[in-house]
Amino acid sequence: MKTILSNQTVDIPENVDISLKGRTVIVKGPRGTLRRDFNHINVELSLLGKKKKRLRVDKWWGNRKELATVRTICSHVQNMIKGVTLGFRYKMRSVYAHFPINVVIQENGSLVEIRNFLGEKYIRRVRMRPGVACSVSQAQKDELVLEGNDIELVSNSAALIQQATTVKNKDIRKFLDGIYVSEKGTVQQADE
């Protein structure tokens, strides 16, 4: 069965400007600008109201999979709005049984060097995605803090760090060493 029209709206806060260029959404906020291209999805995007403070996503004559893209786009736009207002922060903790993992931040937080992982001499270097800054936490031992506006870039950078510390040729149930995401949140606290 085909649904004639499925639509959802996203409310845009006062301190955020949103603009459409075809199916490319550009969100401007206090922390910066994010843009995202939805050209590969066949939907209609439109701004409603006099002040253009509501984004509507329409999908005509879609099957079940195509209708799911409506909510997906809304979620992506909400994440962009959250990113340019509050920013995203991921915290990662080093876990080790014997050899302490030594993490050094290079190039103003854009390069992470991991040394002494499982006592290895090899230095693992992980470059952060553009727009993501990494720092060593002052409050907590063995903690990395990743901050940025784009949730996909921040989470992807965290994944790259976690994948760099995979244990090879050992039983991973026993060898739990690595750097893992311990907390996901925002840079600024939401006023709620």
From Swiss-Prot:
Bilayer-spanning residue ranges: none
Coarse class of the protein's main subcellular location: cytoplasm
InterPro entries: Ribosomal_uL6-like (IPR000702), Ribosomal_uL6-like_a/b-dom_sf (IPR036789), Ribosomal_uL6_a/b-dom (IPR020040), Ribosomal_uL6_CS2 (IPR002359)
Signal peptide feature range: none
The UniProt record lists the keyword Cytoplasm: yes
Keywords: Acetylation, Cytoplasm, Ribonucleoprotein, Ribosomal protein
Subcellular location per the Swiss-Prot or TrEMBL entry: Cytoplasm
A GO cellular-component term linked to this record: cytosolic large ribosomal subunit
UniProt GO BP: cytoplasmic translation
GO MF assignments: rRNA binding; structural constituent of ribosome
Pfam entry (one): Ribosomal_L6
N6-acetyllysine, modified sites: K121
Role this protein plays: Component of the large ribosomal subunit. The ribosome is a large ribonucleoprotein complex responsible for the synthesis of proteins in the cell.
Family assignment from sequence similarity: Belongs to the universal ribosomal protein uL6 family.
Record text on subunit structure and interactions: Component of the large ribosomal subunit.
Protein name: Large ribosomal subunit protein uL6
Native source organism of the sequence: Oryctolagus cuniculus (Rabbit)
Higher taxonomy: Eukaryota, Metazoa, Chordata, Craniata, Vertebrata
